[in-house]
């Protein structure tokens, strides 16, 4: 059972064009990765993991559900794989397995390893599906969580072995607001006894937990001590949540709060297909005005993979984007 056979089954089915397209893309990506690992052509690759009926159901079923849920954009924190080795049909393999590493090429997927877990957490099938979703590794600006679900693994890893997903609607503060105006909470604190590396960790942590923005400002305190003014922007509803995070992960013993009015442009994303992979384009609207910006992470990936400069990638993407607009 090779990629062409599986894709033929999908194409002849009564599935929607949406489900057919994404399901076939996943099977093709897996076949391409396996072919590269085994130094064969795609047509000669006979699936092991994905050849089973249950795996076909997993992949096709996922995209049926995705279509029914009408999900517009996927956001993700970095995904975690284990470490060590695993025994599969081809023998003992390192973790991440070769097919997973091959699938990571041409992507901006962020995968971290937990060296305390000595088993595989990221499979080729799982990563191929995840790759097809074109996830953004940034926190959505504001959101109202509607549902939360968990998928539990059977392996005993010694840790919480589950994948958590949530469905949310991008929204603004629950306070009444006009079309483009709302309120945000600014949290500030002065820090003069933590290293840049420690503060960098704090910034990443706050953004991962949903802060609207985090930034540092160099300041001089009394006795001319150099320090950093740490500023966090969030919603008024999350005041206590971020207060606790800051007390826990920084050396501060106090902070200041200020509620502020702001004007924002409506935001959406589109995916631009390029010869070098997918690139996210951020679209911002305000009373007939339109501003578009190119996702930096996607350009960085292309620049590194194809030995371009960032400027060259930006120009290329901008040219292709202008053609789609025209």
From Swiss-Prot:
<comment type="similarity">
    <text>Belongs to the LarC family.</text>
</comment>
<dbReference type="InterPro" id="IPR002822">
    <property type="entry name" value="Ni_insertion"/>
</dbReference>
<protein>
    <recommendedName>
        <fullName>Putative nickel insertion protein</fullName>
    </recommendedName>
</protein>
<keyword id="KW-0533">Nickel</keyword>
<dbReference type="Pfam" id="PF01969">
    <property type="entry name" value="Ni_insertion"/>
</dbReference>
